[in-house]
């Protein structure tokens, strides 16, 4: 645990980047506070950008901090399995922290505006974002450990991004993008706008 905290102190800038990624998704949907399902989907949907980023970061950090020669030299120290796991968990924790911050903000907004909760599908909606970030981080770490080349970084970023697009095209609800979950709400908002205009 101390090692994870040490890595978190060394990688504090990642927390800011993950917050920015959440902001980029949040700013596209100004009416999110009207619906609980939509709000939670936005928090989880930021993995469209966050997962490729975290995969690339983990691959980069493995190559920079623990190249294959270093891992081989330290293999007999008894902590070889912690060489990359502590670092990976630190990166994942920053991603989860950013998600938690925006989840709290979204929940407070929904409570204040008496948002509709009929579309909630718990716990599915709350789990997909953290799982997607964690899986992408470990994929980046594993790929960097198996393929000792700097090309691992752009390859992992592109591969994870394309995988997100593929899952989105399969229309798996709430998995990796907010778009599928918000289709019903979008239609309601478009219908309600003329009504408000003539009211």
Where is each model-derived feature located?
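Secretory targeting signals
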Residues: 21-53, 58, 88-157
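Helix-loop-helix units of permease transmembrane domains in multi-pass membrane transporters
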Residues: 57-94
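Membrane-interfacial helical/loop segments at transmembrane boundaries in membrane proteins
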Residues: 174-188
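Hydrophobic alpha-helical elements at and bordering transmembrane segments
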Residues: 4, 83-84, 143
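Single conserved hydrophobic/aromatic residue that forms the stacking wall/gate
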Residues: 189-199
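Transmembrane helix segments
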Residues: 151-178
């Amino acid at each position: 645990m101390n090692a994870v905290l040490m890595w978190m102190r060394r990688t504090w800038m990642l927390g800011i980047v993950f917050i920015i990624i959440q902001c980029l998704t949040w700013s596209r949907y100004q009416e999110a506070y009207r619906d609980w399902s939509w709000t939670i989907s936005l928090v989880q949907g930021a993995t469209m950008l966050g997962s490729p980023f975290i995969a690339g970061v983990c691959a980069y950090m493995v190559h920079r901090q623990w190249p294959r020669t270093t891992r081989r030299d330290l293999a007999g120290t008894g902590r070889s399995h912690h060489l990359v796991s502590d670092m990976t968990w630190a990166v994942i924790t920053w991603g989860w922290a950013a998600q938690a911050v925006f989840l709290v903000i979204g929940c407070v907004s929904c409570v204040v505006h008496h948002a509709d909760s009929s579309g909630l599908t718990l716990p599915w909606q709350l789990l997909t974002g953290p799982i997607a970030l964690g899986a992408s981080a470990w994929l980046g770490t594993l790929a960097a450990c198996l393929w000792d080349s700097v090309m691992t970084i752009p390859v992992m970023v592109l591969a994870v991004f394309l995988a997100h697009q593929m899952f989105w095209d399969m229309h798996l609800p709430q998995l990796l993008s907010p778009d599928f979950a918000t289709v019903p709400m979008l239609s309601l908002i478009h219908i309600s706008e003329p009504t408000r205009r003539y009211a």
